[in-house]
A protein has these predicted regions:
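Short, small/polar-rich motifs associated with maturation and membrane association
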Residues: 1-250, 254-257, 261-263
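Cationic-aromatic interfacial patches
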Residues: 266
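Short, intrinsically disordered, charge-balanced linker/junction segments flanking boundaries
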Residues: 270-271
Length: 271
């Protein structure tokens, strides 16, 4: 079913993105890391909750089958793209036209996304440690009037319509001087409910190597996002929209003889 062909001899619409580009994007979710990097792939994020940033994907617009989502294959097995650790991705290829997706039949009618994870190489053992810390903050928040400006402009609008002002001068003075917050509150709820930024952390430890007989690649990872909600500590349980993820990947290739190979791929994710 699968084979190799020189790129210059291929006439199909195929675009490939190397894993290095995915790794260098400071994001914890592969769904967001490839946004804008693959021509023809449209990504629509439907959720901003940490760890749930996935959404809808379309290849060259909407197609005909089911929910129009491309078929995602990770090492030849159907998987969700957002359960992968970006560091374990070797390459991502998208098959966009009928010539490229013909071997997948009806399942490929919406396009196909092929993800290849990293594997061992015939080399000395290579140990890698990747640690990243970043700050995440809201890009744009609405700006609301304070209580005094709202009351003043509300009175002005009523006067312009030939009506009596709703707020008295005494009330306006209280709003202005903020001397009676119980009866004349002036709260900035966005400032109270949201933090200025959240801390995002990501740590990965990988081991890669092999020889002529066996090749291996192992990865363990941890990622977290502290969340943007400004919560207190009165509860024994967490009330913030946070995320903690533990992931593991193990790819082992063993060549028993020249006609018989064994490949064992294991992956897990807990969130």
């Amino acid at each position: 079913l699968f084979g190799k062909q020189r790129k210059e001899l291929s006439t199909s619409a195929i675009t490939t993105l190397k894993g290095g580009y995915v790794k260098n994007v400071p994001n914890l979710n592969p769904f967001n890391t490839i946004t804008g990097l693959l021509p023809g792939l449209i990504m629509i994020q439907n959720n901003g909750e940490p760890g749930e940033e996935g959404g809808s994907m379309y290849l060259r617009g909407q197609r005909t089958l089911g929910n129009n989502t491309p078929w995602v294959l990770v090492d030849g097995i159907q998987r969700n793209l957002d359960i992968l650790d970006p560091d374990e991705i070797e390459s991502i290829s998208i098959l966009k036209d009928a010539a490229a997706t013909a071997i997948y039949g009806l399942r490929g009618s919406n396009g196909v996304i092929l993800v290849t994870t990293k594997r061992g190489k015939n080399q000395k053992i290579q140990i890698g440690l990747d640690a990243r810390v970043a700050m995440q903050s809201p890009t744009k928040l609405p700006e609301f009037l304070g209580s005094y400006d709202y009351a003043r402009l509300y009175n002005e609008a009523l006067i312009n319509d030939g009506q009596q002002p709703y707020y008295t001068q005494e009330a306006l003075d209280h709003y202005y001087f903020k001397d009676d917050p119980i009866h004349y509150p002036d709260n900035d709820y966005l400032d109270q409910y949201l933090k200025k930024h959240s801390i995002q952390q990501k740590y990965n430890l990988s081991v890669r190597g092999g020889n002529n007989i066996a090749k291996y690649y192992f990865l363990v990872g941890y990622a977290s996002n502290s969340g943007l909600y400004n919560v207190d500590k009165i509860n024994t349980y967490g009330t913030n929209a946070t995320m903690k993820t533990y992931s593991v990947r193990s790819n082992v290739d063993v060549q028993v003889n020249k006609n018989f190979d064994i490949r064992l791929d294991l992956s897990g994710r807990m969130q």
